[in-house]
C-alpha cells in the first residue's frame, strides 16, 4: 500500500465499521458517547450515585503523564486472553486518549509473538514470575490455573517494576469506554466495592453499598465473620494503587504462609463450596482493609447501565472475543467489537493473526 492509498483504506475501513456497528439506535447512541456527546441525563437503574456530580470525573492530575502514572494489564497462562489485553491497550490509547504510560505484564508462558504484538500497543511489556500462594482456599480438584496464578497481579505493587506515583490495573476483560484518568486523583488503594445479592447465583454484585466515590470505605463493610454473614468486598478487576516495594515484599512473604494465618473466616456463597474463590482479590481486601477508597461502580460496570458506564466488565462466563459473531445483538458486545476494529485500523496484521489462530471467534468452540 502506498502513502496515497492509506487515507482511502482508512476511510473505507471506517465506513465498514459504521455500516457494521450502527444498525441499532442504542449502538449509535453509545458510539456517540465514546466521543463525549452522550449526556448523563436519563438514568435508568441503580448504578449511579444520585448525589455525585459526574463532572467530578473530568478532574485529572495536573502532572498527568507517562513519567508519573501508568495503566497495566496482565496476561498469564498462555495467550487465551491476548485479545482482551490488546483491546484494553487500544481502548486506552485510541478511544479515551490517555497520556499515562501503558504497561502489560506477562509471564513466561506467553509466546514471543504475543509479547511482540503487545509491544506495539503498550509502551512496555514486562515479563514477571508467576506468584502462587501457600494455599488458595480451593478444593484441590476444583483449582484452575487461571485462579491459582492470579496472585501474579501483586507485581503491580512493586515500585521497582512500576516506578510511578499511581498505577491503575485493568483486567483483560474490562473495556474502558470513557476516560479513567480521574482515578489517578484518588487516595490509594482504590477499588469498586461489591455487595451480596442473596437472590443471585453468584455471591457478589455491584451496588453502592453506602459508600461514596473517592471516600474511605468503612472497614466493617469489608469484614467477613462467618459462613452466613458475608457483607461485601472489593472487585479486583479495576485497582488503583501506589507502588511500594517494602509493602510488596511483605505481601509476598505473607502469601507463603498458610491461609489460616491471614485469610478471612468465611466460605463464599457458592454451591460448589469454594472458599476464598477469587484469591488475590480477597487477599488484597484483607491486606488493605483499613485503607480502601471507593471507586464509583460505573468505572467497572457489569454492563447493566451502559449510558452511564465508563468501563464494561465481563466477569464470569464467556468473554467477548470468544463469541463475536453478531455484535449488533448486544450493545456491550458491539462496543468491544468497535475497539477491536479500532485496533485493526492501526494494526490489521495483529487482528488477522489472532483471528486466524482462533483467539477471536465468531462463536464458542
Q: Language model features by range: what are they?
A:
Residues 91-99:
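Short, acidic, metal-binding catalytic loop of nucleotide-sugar glycosyltransferases
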Amino acid at each position: 500500500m502506498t502513502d496515497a492509498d492509506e487515507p482511502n483504506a482508512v476511510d473505507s475501513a471506517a465506513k465498514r465499521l459504521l455500516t457494521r456497528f450502527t444498525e441499532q439506535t442504542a449502538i449509535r447512541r453509545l458510539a456517540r458517547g465514546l466521543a463525549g456527546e452522550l449526556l448523563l441525563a436519563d438514568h435508568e437503574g441503580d448504578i449511579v450515585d444520585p448525589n455525585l456530580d459526574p463532572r467530578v470525573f473530568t478532574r485529572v492530575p495536573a502532572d498527568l503523564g507517562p513519567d508519573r502514572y501508568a495503566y497495566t494489564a496482565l496476561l498469564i497462562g498462555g495467550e487465551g486472553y491476548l485479545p482482551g489485553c490488546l483491546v484494553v491497550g487500544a481502548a486506552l490509547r485510541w478511544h479515551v486518549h490517555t497520556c499515562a504510560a501503558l504497561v502489560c505484564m506477562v509471564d513466561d508462558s506467553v509466546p514471543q509473538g504475543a509479547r511482540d504484538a503487545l509491544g506495539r500497543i503498550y509502551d512496555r511489556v514486562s515479563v514477571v514470575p508467576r506468584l502462587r500462594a501457600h494455599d488458595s482456599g480451593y478444593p484441590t480438584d476444583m483449582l484452575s490455573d487461571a485462579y491459582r496464578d492470579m496472585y501474579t497481579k501483586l507485581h503491580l505493587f512493586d515500585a521497582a517494576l512500576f516506578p510511578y506515583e499511581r498505577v491503575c490495573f485493568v483486567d483483560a476483560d474490562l473495556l474502558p469506554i470513557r476516560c479513567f484518568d480521574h482515578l489517578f486523583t484518588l487516595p490509594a488503594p482504590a477499588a469498586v466495592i461489591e455487595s451480596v445479592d442473596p437472590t443471585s447465583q453468584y455471591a457478589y454484585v455491584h451496588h453502592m453499598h453506602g459508600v461514596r466515590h473517592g471516600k474511605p470505605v468503612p472497614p466493617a463493610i469489608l469484614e467477613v465473620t462467618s459462613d452466613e454473614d458475608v457483607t461485601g468486598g472489593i472487585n479486583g478487576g479495576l485497582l488503583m494503587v501506589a507502588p511500594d516495594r517494602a509493602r510488596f515484599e511483605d505481601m509476598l512473604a505473607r502469601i507463603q504462609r498458610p491461609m489460616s494465618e491471614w485469610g478471612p473466616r468465611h466460605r463464599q456463597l457458592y454451591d460448589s463450596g469454594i472458599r476464598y474463590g477469587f484469591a488475590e482479590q480477597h487477599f488484597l481486601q484483607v491486606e488493605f482493609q483499613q485503607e480502601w477508597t471507593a471507586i464509583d461502580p460505573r468505572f467497572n460496570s457489569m454492563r447493566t447501565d451502559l449510558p452511564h458506564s465508563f468501563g464494561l466488565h465481563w466477569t464470569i462466563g464467556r468473554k467477548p472475543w470468544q463469541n463475536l459473531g453478531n455484535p449488533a445483538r448486544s450493545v456491550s458486545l458491539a462496543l468491544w467489537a468497535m475497539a477491536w476494529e479500532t485496533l485493526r485500523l492501526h494494526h490489521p496484521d495483529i487482528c488477522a493473526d489472532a483471528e486466524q489462530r482462533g483467539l477471536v471467534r465468531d462463536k464458542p468452540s
